A protein has these predicted regions:
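Loop/turn elements at helix/coil->beta-strand transitions in domains of secreted/extracellular proteins
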Residues: 32-36, 68-74, 105-107, 114-117
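Typically the conserved alpha-helix immediately C-terminal to a functionally engaged Cys/Sec
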Residues: 49-65
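A short beta-strand-turn-helix
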Residues: 19-36, 66
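Thiol-based oxidoreductase modules, predominantly thioredoxin-like and allied folds used
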Residues: 18-19, 62-91
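Short active-site neighborhood of thiol/selenol oxidoreductases, capturing the structured segment around
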Residues: 32-46
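The canonical Cys-X-X-Cys-His
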Residues: 46-49, 109
């Protein structure tokens, strides 16, 4: 019985998908009338990036919220050979960085609308709880258009 409960929790738990193509993310955001959260990360070398992912972006509270309210885009810039991205993904990430993160900040997170207009940004690790992070995003989600 316990195994069944665990299985159901895993299957029924909300999940989120981090996209790698900003154009596709904008299309999805337009179709679903959602905002886009872009996260620039160095997943295998940037301590604050890893902390942001583990403490906020992978928290149950954020995953539950994002699954219903956001389109997520991750532009990752790993350094270790075992984590190398495809050449196509590297080009997509570099193009996104040219547009939104020319200074090369890590971590750098932005909330943008479906047209790509920046609504809010977080430079570095946001020293707050997942709930506080969500509240900041939610203030833009609930604004009339």
């Amino acid at each position: 019985m316990k195994l069944l409960a665990i299985y159901l929790l895993l299957v029924l738990s909300p999940s989120v998908t981090w996209m790698g193509d900003f154009s596709q993310a904008k299309n999805e955001a337009a179709q679903k009338h959602r905002l886009i959260l872009i996260n620039f990360s160095g997943s295998d070398w940037c301590g604050p990036c890893i902390r942001l992912r583990k403490e906020i972006l992978e928290s149950d509270a954020f995953v539950n919220y994002a699954s219903d309210h956001l389109v997520l885009v991750r532009a990752d810039f790993p350094r270790q050979k075992k984590n190398q991205l495809s050449k196509e993904q590297v080009k997509l990430n570099e193009a996104l960085a040219d547009k939104y993160n020319a200074d090369g900040k890590f971590p750098y997170t932005l909330l943008v609308d479906e047209n790509g207009k920046v609504l809010k940004d977080w430079d570095g690790f946001p020293n707050e709880t997942p709930e506080q992070f969500i509240a900041q995003i939610n203030s833009f989600v609930q604004q009339p258009k």
